[in-house]
């Protein structure tokens, strides 16, 4: 670089002016690249949000339809003015002596009450029989949840239900169509059934009951099949909502596919809305970019469509 005398002055690599100029030369390309990446991410997020809104709308309609369907069943089976124990007996009586149903249904892992209520084969499997019972009990105004009986390896060997009656979670076995009772005829809880004598008195009179189905190891929510992710989710949910495993809502979500789908779609939609809010803040504050609003784009597309139609 020449000074006023025409001599050449060497510029050090650490010269602040040189460093400033170099940054100024690179910054436009980096900013342009960041703008392109930001706009692409914005478009993808907006598209996913539209899909999530559509999924949430469809799942809400599905859950509403399922709820109406199960409510119709419970209204026809359970007298609304009955006591809680009478409602339980009415549901079990219907499961045993209800109208003829189709013999062969889907596999036993299904969790859709519109299916489990209509196939005799599904009402003979502990998982789907409990699914039908829990959904009918919920529609009849009872607080009910499923209970998993585990073996020594923590694997599920049987599924029953618990119903809140007079402040106690009494045990009901839907597949055997019975309310478990002790030798005096009193209803029993899960804790009561850990007593060997009470367990034998409650189950010895049930035809075909496997004595291995004990209540020594039980869970309401089984997440071990998810491996490490299941353990992480259990800990995370436990910190966010202590006692969530014992809640009626958690059990109902697991026993009704439409409700689980609806909650998943709504949570995804909320997460994408929050992501768009963050992206908009980042674009405006950090990049100086104002992303176009989805509503404004749709309005322009709508107007252009009608303008082209009017021109024709």
Model features per residue range: what roles?
Residues 131-201:
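Hydrophobic/aromatic-rich core segments of domains that either
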Residues 34-42, 247-269:
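Juxtamembrane/start-of-transmembrane alpha-helix segments at the extracytoplasmic/lumenal side
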Residues 176-247:
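Extracytoplasmic/lumenal ectodomains and periplasmic regions of secretory and membrane proteins
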Residues 46-52, 256-282:
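Selective detector of the "anchor" transmembrane alpha-helix that sits immediately C-terminal
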Residues 54-124:
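Secondary-structure boundary elements
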Residues 270-301:
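Juxtamembrane interface at the cytosolic side of transmembrane helices
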Residues 29-62:
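Hydrophobic secretory-pathway targeting helix
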Residues 2-25:
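N-terminal intrinsically disordered, acidic low-complexity segments at the extreme N-terminus
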């Amino acid at each position: 670089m020449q000074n006023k005398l025409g001599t050449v002055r060497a510029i050090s690599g650490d010269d602040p002016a040189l460093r400033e100029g170099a940054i100024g030369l690179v910054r436009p390309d980096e900013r342009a690249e960041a703008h392109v990446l930001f706009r692409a991410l914005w478009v993808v997020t907006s598209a996913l949000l539209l899909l999530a809104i559509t999924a949430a709308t469809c799942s809400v309609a599905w859950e509403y339809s399922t709820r109406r369907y199960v409510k119709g069943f419970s209204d026809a089976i359970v007298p609304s003015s009955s006591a809680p124990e009478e409602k339980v007996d009415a549901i079990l009586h219907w499961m045993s002596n209800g109208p003829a149903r189709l013999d062969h249904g889907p596999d036993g892992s299904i969790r859709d009450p519109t299916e489990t209520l209509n196939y005799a084969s599904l009402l003979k499997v502990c998982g789907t029989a409990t699914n039908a019972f829990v959904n009918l009990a919920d529609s009849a105004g009872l607080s009910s949840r499923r209970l998993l009986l585990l073996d020594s390896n923590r694997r599920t060997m049987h599924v029953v239900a618990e119903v809140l009656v007079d402040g106690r979670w009494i045990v009901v076995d839907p597949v055997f169509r019975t309310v478990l009772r002790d030798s005096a005829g009193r209803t029993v809880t899960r804790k009561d059934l850990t007593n060997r004598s009470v367990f034998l008195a409650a189950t010895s009179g049930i035809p075909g009951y496997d004595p291995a189905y004990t209540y020594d190891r039980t869970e309401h929510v089984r997440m071990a099949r998810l491996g490490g992710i299941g353990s992480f989710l259990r800990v995370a949910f436990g910190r966010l909502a202590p006692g969530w495993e014992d809640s009626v809502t958690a059990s109902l979500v697991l026993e009704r596919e439409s409700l689980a789908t609806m909650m998943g779609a709504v949570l995804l939609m909320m997460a994408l809305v929050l992501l768009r809010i963050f992206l908009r803040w980042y674009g405006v504050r950090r990049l100086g970019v104002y992303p176009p609003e989805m509503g404004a784009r749709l309005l322009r597309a709508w107007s252009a469509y009608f303008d082209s139609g009017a021109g024709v």
